[in-house]
From Swiss-Prot:
The modification Phosphoserine is found at S11, S31, S35, S317, S645, S1247, S1252. Its main location: cytoplasm. Residues 932-944 have a biased composition (Basic and acidic residues). The keyword Lyase does not apply. The modification N6-acetyllysine is found at K991. The keyword ATP-binding does not apply. It comes from Homo sapiens (Human). InterPro entries: KH_dom (IPR004087), KH_dom_type_1 (IPR004088), KH_dom_type_1_sf (IPR036612). GO terms for biological process: cholesterol metabolic process; lipid transport. Residues 158-229, 230-302, 303-371, 372-442, 443-514, 515-588, 589-660, 661-734, 735-807, 808-880, 881-979, 980-1059, 1060-1134, 1135-1209 form the KH domain. This is Vigilin. Appears to play a role in cell sterol metabolism. It may function to protect cells from over-accumulation of cholesterol.
Length: 1268
């Protein structure tokens, strides 16, 4: 099919250099000189009158018919045959079995082709493949590779032909492999081999080999030749618009590559078949030799700026000179400073060419007009209207304004440029006479104050003095402000701006000292709090120091009064922060932490809220007992008193106040609290609280069990007395492993030293860095005596001795079981003494001890005690029903572990039996035995305890009996509590959380009856000591639930209010803000009707809560409705180009306007029919004020938008092209649409103009079309 393109003159000129001579006619540059346009019939030849395709179906007639291709079927079928000798899988009894079937299935799934297999009489395999062409070819390749035995062969072709076998991106090779169903391996480029390996069937190999050799043979016919030709003669060989070289290429079929003028290469490359290539080379050589003899050169000087006019757009002018005169014009490169242009050609034609070169050079000129850069936008005019007058008269002149330069550049035909220059110079002169500008320096930090809130100050100055004020953006940090306009207005604006700046320079700067730790809190998360302060004091600049500087100075700058107000505000804020950051630590016994937290955190939450403090408790798995309270000092003290009172109520905790002079407190506490900690640990972990340093109080509070408090009081007073009389301290060192031995069992040894000398000995705590240091405090003589005793003990410990003792082998196992637990305990207690028992299996009774002499003796004594216990060991049975065993053991066996430690006994529980109930069935005789034979009598006695109930206790008799009593005391007891059935589910709580919490808190088991029983009785099982507390807790919970039920009944009061659905969104508010506030304020639930529910009244809003609260909420909603009914909505046309600026970043600006005027402003969505329509809703007077305000903003912003758009047009770089008259496009004559109206309209009744259809013609067989 032919195609018709509509070309403008510009695009025609751009493309003609690439067309062959037969396709174009020579055209001149000016459209006026063009030949007559072609007729419509020439441009669009009519189709043949009679379609020959019906008469001659096999040979369609006409140029259009030649292009028709038969439609190919989308699904094809191919059949492949695999001979018996080439089959991979021959040994098959039946088709469809084994590996062959699997392979076919895989091929079908992967390729999407359909396979059908059949066996011929000669046992050859026929495969029919159906599907799309690609799928069939891929399936065929897979079938050959996997069902047919593979052979291989090699073919050698020249290495340089390999790339033609591969083809572009390997496409040729892939295609070849698919066609021949083979695998072709070509050596890598770095491999010198020229052998190509082909793998596949014999038939496929032959085909592939043939194709490869054909490709190689085809390449053998072709040749490449390079011809060196001087660069200067390339234009003659190429010819004007590359026509000459195009002709040679077309006639010889040879490809000729001439390097472009920009590439500094001289060789011309020829590619083609050898004979034609030789002809092409001969013709080029002939042209080169001829031109070399006949041509000569002349050099002329042409201004560098005019070179581009000689070259012309895309080199067209050079081609035009070459075409007209046969002379080549050589222009120096653009980066060269040379202005010499060389003309090369036959002598008689050089004159004409030189004339044309000068004509082209002088056809355009460049001129400049001096104009201050600040006047440029006034010269351009509003929306570019001033310049439009000049450019409309002289469209070929290009006017360029360069930002920052005091000149305007004009470029175009000389006459037009001169006229335009005169006009622009007149405009500049007029503007200079009428206008003035001034530049003033004002510190950039004052610029935003000069601009004012939303540009209020600067806009007032602009309107008042009719001037333009240019303030640089903050990012430039420039101090220069430029004022342009009427000379008088400029001076007045300058005076006012300088006065404002002067006033600001006289502003006060104040340094505020705020501890750096509070800076982050004052700034707030993402700067929220500091933003609030800045909004409160907008005229004050607040600068915080860089965190890396570690500075406490915060700088405030602004008007004196505002700075003072801001200072007071921030000082008050800091005072509140300091006051609220007071912190105290309260030591509370760990077992009472859960009581202080209370049920669901109720107690701790109540204390926090009422005291307005932050209370941090240690983690449950932490060993710390300290609770930290943070807040105001008075509040912290109140919270501490409440927490301590809870502890006091819960246990037998005594509290004693001791008066000790404040000056002794630090010495009593000791370094890092070591001294006071040693007293607290020694006296059963009592809590000793000293008053805050600097308070002047002498009162020290001791809190804990009564006996321990008295003991601690005595020690504290004794220590204080010592400190007051004379305090002396000595440090001695001993290995950490000796410390336990020096302290002795239960602190016996160290107590003996203290009692005998009167000195206090302090050992390091586990967290202390120096673990060797032991401190002795007291009177000098007592300290010296204690030091002497301890050093003697340490010296003895340093003297290592080895001793042995005899231990009956039957007892050895007791010492080494559980990975030598008993031996480890002995080593820890007796200064790291090493005890070695003989290896198991040997009958030796000798045990070796190695360590300090005293330690060895003490260890021997301890081993002897253990042996005596073992020999005096008895076994007692304690019968406790198996169902109570888990309760007796306690969490993770903690209760049993405590009993074994307290009474030094071993306790063994029986194995658990699945059937824990007594069997009522008679005992079955086994092997004819009587019921009692071979069994203990007690097993058969129904009254005796079961084996699974018996707990074995081993140890000394008296200790076993005491342990038995302790175990029996752990057997849980059950009591019943009456709780109304309807409260049971609330007692259980969500997913059992309530009942589980109560069980954990009181360490009991609570059994709630099944719902179907409708019983009011709840059973509590646990230790007798815990039952009373659990019962009281349960009854307390019942009281709470009953109170909640009553409260729920009161809260369920419902009230309906009728409100028009159109007001619902306003009542709900943005993101539900309004309705949420009403809900929270009145503590009610407000339900709006469901829009999708047609049965529900859409104007009913339901309020649920206390009766008084629902009525208050109803009144609040009706107030909003009343306000909304008074509101009006008005549409205002607002240019869409300024919408974004009015809305502001993230809607900040529009929100400010809406808040200021108390209106709602809605902008059109993208794609709206009227993009300029903005809706304002609110009270009538507010709507009017808001509309006036946004229309003022529109006028101000629109001026900037228009100026910016106009400037953009003239700030673009010039297109260095010849100016042309407006294009006429593609023109034809005698087109149907140009027929004169006088022509007669077609006669619809005429049979000639509208012939009737003849009789139906019998259809003829066509080469393609629908199936018959």
């Amino acid at each position: 099919m032919s195609s018709v393109a509509v070309l403008t003159q510009e695009s025609f000129a751009e493309h003609r250099s690439g067309l062959v001579p037969q396709q174009i006619k020579v055209a001149t540059l000016n459209s006026e000189e063009e030949s007559d346009p072609p007729t419509y019939k020439d441009a669009f030849p009519p189709l043949p009158e009679k379609a020959a395709c019906l008469e001659s179906a096999q040979e369609p007639a006409g140029a259009w018919g030649n292009k028709i291709r038969p439609i190919k079927a989308s699904v094809i079928t191919q059949v492949f045959h695999v001979p018996l000798e080439e089959r991979k899988y021959k040994d098959m009894n039946q088709f469809g079995e084994g590996e062959q079937a699997k392979i076919c299935l895989e091929i079908m799934q992967r390729t999407g082709a359909h396979l059908e297999l059949s066996l011929a009489k000669d046992q050859g395999l026929s495969i029919m493949v159906s599907g799309k062409l690609d799928a069939v070819m891929k399936a065929r390749k897979d079938i050959v590779a996997r069902l047919q035995t593979q052979a291989s062969a090699t073919v050698a072709i020249p290495k340089e032909h390999h790339r033609f076998v591969i083809g572009k991106n390997g496409e040729k090779l892939q295609d070849l492999e698919l066609k021949t169903a083979t695998k072709i391996q070509i050596p890598r480029p770095d491999d010198p081999s020229n052998q190509i390996k082909i793998t596949g069937t014999k038939e496929g190999i032959e085909k592939a080999r043939h194709e490869v050799l054909l490709i190689s043979a085809e390449q053998d016919k072709r040749a490449v030749e390079r011809l060196e030709v001087e660069k200067a003669f390339h234009p003659f060989i190429a010819g004007p618009y590359n026509r000459l070289v195009g002709e040679i290429m077309q006639e010889t079929g040879t490809r000729i590559n001439i390097p472009p003028p920009s590439v500094n290469r001289t060789e011309i490359v020829f590619t083609g078949e050898k004979e034609q290539l030789a002809q092409a080379v001969a013709r080029i050589k002939k042209i080169y030799e001829e031109k070399k003899k006949k041509t000569t050169t002349i050099a002329v000087e042409v201004k560098k700026s005019q070179h581009k006019y000689v070259i012309g757009p895309k080199g067209n002018s050079l081609q035009e000179i070459l075409e007209r005169t046969g002379v080549s014009v050589e222009i120096p490169p653009s980066d060269s400073i040379s202005e010499t242009v060389i003309l090369r050609g036959e002598p008689e034609k050089l004159g004409q060419a030189l004339t044309e070169v000068y004509a082209k050079a002088n056809s355009f000129t460049v001129s400049s007009v001096a104009a201050p850069s600040w006047l440029h936008r006034f010269i351009i005019g509003k929306k570019g209207q001033n310049l439009a007058k000049i450019t409309q008269q002289m469209p070929k002149v290009h006017i360029e304004f360069t930002e920052g330069e005091d000149k305007i550049t004009l470029e175009g035909p000389t006459e037009d440029v001169n006229v335009a220059q005169e006009q622009i110079e007149g405009m500049v002169k007029d503007l200079i006479n009428r206008m003035d500008y001034v530049e003033i320096n004002i510190d950039h930090k004052f610029h935003r104050h000069l601009i004012g809130k939303s540009g209020a100050n600067i806009n007032r100055i602009k309107d008042q003095y009719k001037v333009s004020v240019r303030i640089p953006p903050d990012s430039e940090k420039s101090n220069l402000i430029r004022i342009e306009g009427d000379p008088q207005g400029v001076q007045q604006a300058k005076r006012e701006l300088l006065e404002l700046a002067s006033r600001m320079e006289n502003e006060r700067t104040k340094d505020l000292i705020i501890e750096q730790r509070f800076h982050r809190t004052i700034i707030g998360q993402k700067g929220e709090r500091i933003r609030e302060i800045r909004d409160k004091f907008p005229e004050v600049i607040i600068n915080f120091p860089d965190p890396a500087q570690k500075s406490d100075i915060v700088q405030l700058r602004g008007p004196k009064n505002e700075v003072e107000k801001c200072t007071k505000y921030m000082q008050k804020m800091v005072a509140d922060l300091v006051e609220n950051s007071y912190s105290i630590s309260v030591p509370i016994f760990k077992q009472f932490h859960k009581n202080i937290i209370g049920k669901g955190g109720a107690n701790i939450k109540k204390i926090r809220e009422e005291s307005n403090t932050k209370i941090d408790l240690p983690a449950e798995n932490s060993n710390s007992e300290t609770i930290i309270i943070t807040g105001k000092r008075a509040n912290c003290e109140a919270a501490r008193s409440r927490i301590l009172s809870i502890q006091k109520d819960l246990a037998n905790i005594a509290e004693v106040e001791v008066s000790i002079p404040a000056k002794l407190h630090n010495s009593l506490i000791g370094t890092k609290g070591r001294l006071i900690r040693s007293i607290m640990e020694e006296c059963g972990g009592v809590h000793i609280h000293f008053p805050v340093e600097g308070s002047g109080s002498d009162t020290v509070v001791i809190r804990g069990p009564s006996s321990d408090v008295e003991k601690a009081k005595k020690q504290l007073l004794h220590l204080a007395e010592e400190k007051q009389t004379k305090s002396f301290t000595v440090d001695i060192r001993a290995k950490p492993e000796y410390h336990k031995f020096l302290i002795g069992k239960g602190g016996g040894k160290i107590r003996k030293v203290r009692d005998s000398t009167g000195a206090r000995v302090i050992f390091p705590a586990a967290e202390d860095k120096d673990q060797d240091l032991i401190t002795i405090i007291g009177k000098e003589d007592a300290v010296r005596e204690a030091q002497k005793e301890l050093e003697a003990l340490i010296q003895n410990l340093d003297n290592v001795v080895e001793d042995s003792m005899l231990v009956d082998p039957k007892h050895h196992r007791h010492f080494v079981i559980r990975r030598g637990q008993v031996l480890r305990e002995i080593a820890e207690e007796y200064g790291g003494v090493m005890v070695s028992f003989p290896r198991s299996g040997t009958q030796s009774d000798k045990v070796t001890l190695k360590g300090a002499k005293d330690c060895v003796e003490a260890a021997k004594k301890r081993i002897q005690e253990i042996i005596e216990d073992l020999e005096a060991q008895v076994t007692l049975e304690c019968a406790i029903p198996q169902k109570f065993h888990r309760s007796v053991m306690g969490p993770k066996g903690s209760r049993i572990q405590q009993i074994t430690r307290d009474f030094s006994v071993q306790i063994k529980f029986p194995d658990r039996e699945e059937n824990a109930v007594h069997s009522t069935e008679p005992v079955v005789q086994e092997n004819g035995d009587e019921a009692g034979e071979g069994r203990e009598a007690k097993d058969c006695d129904p009254g005796s305890p079961r084996r699974c109930d018996i707990i074995i206790i081993s140890g000394r008799k008296e200790k076993c009996e005491a342990a038995k009593e302790a175990l029996e005391a752990l057997v849980p007891v059950t009591i019943e509590v009456e709780v109304p059935f309807d409260l049971h589910r609330y007692v259980i709580g969500q997913k059992g959380s309530g009942i589980r919490k109560m069980m954990d808190e009181f360490e009991v088991n609570i059994h709630v009856p099944a719902p179907e029983l409708q019983s009011d009785i709840i059973a509590i099982t646990g230790l007798a000591a815990n039952l009373d507390r659990a019962k009281a807790g349960l009854l307390e919970r019942v009281k709470e639930l009953q109170a909640e039920q009553e409260d729920r009944a009161l809260r369920s009061f419902k009230l309906s209010v009728t409100v028009d659905p159109k007001y619902h969104p306003k009542i709900i508010g943005r993101k539900g803000a309004v309705i949420t506030q009403i809900r929270l304020e009145h503590d009610v639930n407000i339900q709006f009707p469901d829009k999708d529910d047609g049965n529900q009244p859409q104007d009913q809003i339901t309020i649920t809560g206390y009766e008084k609260n629902t009525e208050a909420a109803r009144d609040a909603i009706l107030r909003i409705v009343g306000e909304l009914e008074q509101m009006v909505s008005e549409d205002v046309p607002l240019d869409h180009r300024v919408h974004a600026r009015i809305i502001g970043a993230r809607g900040k600006a529009i929100r400010k306007i809406m808040d200021e005027f108390k209106v709602d402003i809605r902008f059109p969505q993208s794609g709206a029919p009227d993009p300029n329509c903005v809706t304002v809703t609110g009270l009538p007077e507010n709507v009017e004020e808001a509309i006036d305000h946004i229309l003022n903003l529109e006028e101000e912003y629109l001026a900037d938008v228009v100026d910016s758009e106009a400037l953009q047009v003239y700030m673009k770089p010039p297109a260095h092209e010849e100016a042309k008259a407006p294009s006429r496009g593609f023109v034809v004559r005698d087109a149907p649409w140009t027929a004169s109206s006088s022509e007669k309209a077609p006669d619809m009744s005429s049979s000639e103009e509208f012939p009737s259809f003849g009789a139906q013609v019998a259809p003829k067989t066509l080469p393609w079309g629908p199936k018959r």
